[in-house]
Amino acid sequence: MPRTKRQKSEDGIYHIMIKSITEVPLFKKHEDKIRYLKQMREYQKIYGFKVYAYCLMSNHGHFIIDSNGADISKIMHGLNFKYAITFNRIYKRNGHLFQDRFKSKMVDTQRYLIMLSAYIHNNPLDIRGYEKCPEKYKYSSLKVYLGLERDNTGLLDEGFIMQFFSNNVKEARERYAKLVYICDDEKMKRELEFKDEKTEYRSERKVIIRNFDPQEILKFISKETGINEIMFYIRNNKNSKIVKALASLLMRSFCNYNCKDICKVLGNIAQSTVSRLCSIGVELISTEDKYKNLINKFISEHSNLKAMGYT
């Protein structure tokens, strides 16, 4: 039976579920969960999507993701592929790790969004020792919602959902806690099961339109780095590597380009090289002070991106 086409929207909010094949746990150790979240953060820096809630269990994980104009399939396929490669290398195994495609369901109402977050945060209730205290589970965003811990992943935007409870942080946390602790019932679980529904969340949120001309990216990178544009086409040079890495990162983010598209722009490089350059670009904006504000500066210089929530 052919697979149904995934329902997607450039301004969609999604319930994403990942799951491993039956015989293999998705996360064998706690370090695996940490690694997955770190790798998701790397992809977040590339694509600028938002994560509103998450919970990682031993064989599956749940997320609420706002694509913010990016292609959710590109994000999840790339992320899961990278995690599977790393997992197989560490545990000396071959073959598939994830069960089929990731599952996604578009969120259609504010009520559904709120109840979905509570459902996700209640997942640890099935684990011995957490039956009455899901907030103590380390690999869930509930602890951040309730103010018990800071978000150490850098992934989370809990404020988007919490604002529906109160503008006052303390009141919002108290009201959200009450919701989580009263909504662990079978009716809610049935409501939130994945079905073949074509639903869509629409709001006043503005999203990034990712259709920039790649030449505009190259000019911006050259201006900000002070490195001549000719270096985009030179091989085996330190400056060339820097500008190519930053350009690859921004083209993936703001042009919605894949590795093949970027190869055509930069010329005479392999897709695997582009993938490595993108990783270098993420490292540069994460660790080098002179590049840390590069993406925000690009946004501030282009009025159609300004105030669209890219962080």
Task: Go through the PLM ranges and name each one.
Residues 62:
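Conserved G/P- and acidic residue-centered "switch" motifs that form tight phosphate/ATP-binding loops
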